[in-house]
């Protein structure tokens, strides 16, 4: 069993592997501010606010409408405590508009779910890591890979990595 929830002492979960590539790109491009969008309970938004705070980068999160559950309340509080600027986007269309309007020189856009080709390299890399562990005899070849999904970016990247490996 892979335990990506233990991948970082700051914030665990599948975003850590994605952000390894995304944040490297941010610094390579000399960006000084992060803009992202997501639901009120977005774990990607939480990861962004926490990693942004740790790196000294201002973060703006444009939230789209979502039921306010206990988890959503905790996510909002976590983002606020990390210093993120929280913007109410409302419906999806207005969220897209407000996110676009938030971008200016120096801004780095992280898509909802951190789901894009660059971020997906994190989970293609995870499949290579898994294959290496199997080849070294550290674990048996898995019969199945099970994971929760939101934007399905992780699922797509794992499937791509698995197809490359055969």
Question: Which role fits each region the language model picked out?
Answer:
Residues 1-166:
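PLP-dependent amino-acid enzyme catalytic core
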């Amino acid at each position: 069993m892979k335990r990506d929830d233990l991948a970082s002492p700051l914030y665990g979960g599948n975003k850590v592997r994605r952000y390894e590539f995304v944040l490297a790109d941010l610094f390579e491009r000399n960006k000084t501010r992060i803009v992202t969008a997501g639901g009120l309970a977005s774990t990607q938004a939480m990861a962004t606010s926490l990693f942004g705070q740790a790196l000294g980068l201002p973060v703006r999160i444009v939230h789209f409408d979502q039921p306010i559950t206990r988890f959503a309340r905790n996510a909002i509080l976590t983002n606020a405590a990390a210093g993120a600027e929280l913007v109410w986007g409302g419906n999806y269309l207005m969220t897209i508009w407000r996110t676009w309007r938030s971008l200016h020189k120096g801004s780095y856009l992280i898509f909802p779910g951190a789901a894009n080709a660059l971020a997906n390299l994190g989970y293609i890399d995870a499949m290579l890591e898994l294959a290496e562990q199997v080849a070294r005899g550290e674990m048996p070849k898995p019969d199945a890979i099970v994971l929760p999904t939101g934007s399905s970016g992780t699922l797509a990247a794992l499937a791509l990595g698995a197809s490359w490996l055969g």
